[in-house]
Amino acid sequence: MWSTRSPNSTAWPLSLEPDPGMASASTTMHTTTIAEPDPGMSGWPDGRMETSTPTIMDIVVIAGVIAAVAIVLVSLLFVMLRYMYRHKGTYHTNEAKGTEFAESADAALQGDPALQDAGDSSRKEYFI
């Protein structure tokens, strides 16, 4: 039933001692010895086990995953670069033309034609 394999493929039985509080009963233990390694594995004299070589299907699956990740990364790079260059320089300010030569900010804004009222000049708005 339960066995432990040693490096040289012999089996040792595990000790199953009965519980001291239980009545004694006869227990039969089966041990098995395995003379050869498991199928699909080839044993080495020093106790190492060599795994089987990967199949073609394993290689195809791994290559597909790597290709999908590469395509996603290239797509993201393309989208990021396109977005960066498309929006480069689109920040516009609405400053009045010729304000760099004015003596003060008020004088520059008084001469700006975009800020002149076409109608009533008696109404003024003050910002505090």
From Swiss-Prot:
Residue ranges with Polar residues bias: 1-12
Question: What UniProt keywords apply to this chain's record, in alphabetical order?
Answer: Blood group antigen, Cell membrane, Glycoprotein, Membrane, Phosphoprotein, Sialic acid, Transmembrane, Transmembrane helix
Q: Which residues does the record list as glycosylated?
A: 3-4, 6, 8-10, 15, 24, 26-28, 31-33, 42
Topological type in the membrane: Single-pass type III membrane protein
Feature: compositional bias, Low complexity: 22-33
Query: Could you tell me where this protein is found in the cell?
Result: Cell membrane
> One GO CC annotation, please?
cortical cytoskeleton
Chief subcellular location equals membrane
Query: What the protein does?
Result: This protein is a minor sialoglycoprotein in human erythrocyte membranes. The blood group Gerbich antigens and receptors for Plasmodium falciparum merozoites are most likely located within the extracellular domain. Glycophorin-C plays an important role in regulating the stability of red cells.
The protein's name is Glycophorin-C
Give the species this sequence originates from: Homo sapiens (Human)
Q: What is the lineage of its organism?
A: Eukaryota, Metazoa, Chordata, Craniata, Vertebrata
